[in-house]
From Swiss-Prot:
InterPro entries: Ribosomal_bL19, Ribosomal_bL19_sf, Translation_prot_SH3-like_sf. Gene3D superfamilies: 2.30.30.790. This is Large ribosomal subunit protein bL19. It comes from Solidesulfovibrio magneticus (strain ATCC 700980 / DSM 13731 / RS-1). PANTHER family: LARGE RIBOSOMAL SUBUNIT PROTEIN BL19M, RIBOSOMAL PROTEIN L19. The gene is rplS. The lineage of its organism: Bacteria, Pseudomonadati, Thermodesulfobacteriota, Desulfovibrionia, Desulfovibrionales. Belongs to the bacterial ribosomal protein bL19 family.
Length: 116
């Protein structure tokens, strides 16, 4: 086993739940401002997953006050307190960039049921 592979394996988090594009998740972030520390929650739909070991990222989109906000999170970041899966979405694409152009009810994602 390579030394680099061993270091990457040590830095990977094992407490991340399984989620896919289309799922609605809550990302609890640890924000450090000066000497204060607080938790900020970012809830939205997963647009994409990029798997690459320690370098894995995922993009979450939410609409805040009528403005679309997208944020890219490193999967194994120490600033992520936890990730909660709120709802599982039923989509047929792995990249949901088409949601950027949709507004209102058209931007909704169907929920996945147990037999889907």
């Amino acid at each position: 086993m390579n030394v680099i592979d061993q270091l990457e394996r040590e830095q990977m988090r094992m407490d991340i739940p399984a989620f896919r594009p289309g799922d609605t998740i809550k990302v609890h972030l640890r924000i450090i401002e000066g000497e204060k520390e607080r938790i900020q929650v970012f809830q939205g739909a997963v647009l994409r997953l990029r798997k690459g070991g320690v370098d894995s990222t995922f993009t979450v989109r939410k609409v805040s006050d009528g403005v679309g906000v997208e944020r890219v999170f490193p999967m194994h970041s120490p600033f992520i307190e936890r990730i909660e899966v709120v709802a599982q979405g039923k989509v047929r694409r792995s990249r949901l960039y088409y949601l950027r152009a949709l507004r209102g009810k058209a931007a909704r994602i169907k929920t996945r049921t147990a037999w889907d």
